[in-house]
Amino acid sequence: LFDQTISEFQFVEQRIWIKDFINYKVGVDGISILFILLTTFITPLCVISINNSIKESLSEFLIAVLIMESFMIGVFCSLDLVIFYLFFEAGLIPMFLIIGIWGGARRVYSAFKFFLYTLLGSVLMLVAIISIYWLNGTTDIVELYESGIDIKYQNLLWLAFFSSFAVKTPMWPVHTWLPDAHVEAPTAGSVLLAAILLKMAGYGFIRFSLGLFPVASEIFTPLIYTLSVIAIIFTSFIALMQEDMKKLIAYSSVAHMGYVTLGIFTIQQQGIEGSIIQMISHGLVSAALFLCVGVVYDRMHSRLINTYGGIVSIVPKYSILFMVFTLAALGLPGTSGFVGEFLILMGAFKDNFLVAVIASIGVIIGAAYMLWLYKRVIFGKLINNDLKQMIDLNKSEVFILSCLAVPTLFFGFYPEPLINTIEVSISDLIDEYNFRLAGRL
């Protein structure tokens, strides 16, 4: 069983792949295990949900989804930089196919935009990994933690990794691929993209930016703060202007990931814990919101907000579950969304009061666009007569959304299992960070 009381990697497996260069080495710690559990929880729900939305080449679609799951698990348990990079980039291929083959009218454009943005962002990371091998003679993450990386090279290496993680997060201003990808992707593709794929970058910031380049992370923290605050405020206002439900949720994802990057670089226990909990919560809530959009799209073939309104009495089960996830997305106390945001802001107030105050404004704007979305879709007058024929959630849809609602509410009232799992690993990471910073290595 996994031991929460130690920070070392557990269940480690190692095999020689290319002698004196690459080892296949995998393992988990308190940070990575939560993302692996999230991946293995969300993917089966995606598989169950596709029975209505995918009409052609269903078996091929399932193959792409399951291959993608394998690559994402590989990312979270990799203990070698080369293995991490291979899994990190290989995950692009099935998502590219999911968008490009089973997506909407502009699927080819969106698929190539997604692929090129994320691939080009990762080229510098490959160069950095090769440089690290040249400098240290190893790409083993555990060995690199122990030996440290020369301070003379940390800034350039940090920027190279940042170029990849910033695009994948995505951070402002390299976020424009995400709304297009979400709009054109099938529902299951949007769920995987928002719930898991974006988390690989947040995980990368914690594992590599803080773990390998502490001196550079300290230097570039003001840059991260600036970009995070812009993402939180700017994309929240953009979300308020959207008429497409998927685009609104996509922009809200950029804002939520802005909180994640802010919390990570506070280098505070509460901040990093909050960022991880926020990523887990966002994985659950964003998956549910995209599934909710998929439900009404399957029935009415429209994602436009003004198509709907006045359906609360027609689809009561849908209205209740949609309300749960809307409130979780805006961070209502008692939902998992509140726990992450609260801890992040606690960490931010300890490190930089002004940044924390500005980021807090995003909470208000977030509540505005989520409540505005819910009000226009669920309440109001029934103008569109076609909505009278709308069918409420079937048993399969109730099951899927309930599976997401239960942990969303449970961790909102009792986040202790999440905190206990990550606490020791984060504490050890911060101690090592401060030790390296004090020694300037």
Locate the predicted segments by residue:
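Cytoplasmic/organellar membrane-interface segments at the starts of transmembrane helices
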Residues: 315-317, 370-441
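Transmembrane helix-loop-helix hairpins at membrane boundaries of multipass inner-membrane proteins
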Residues: 1-63, 142, 428
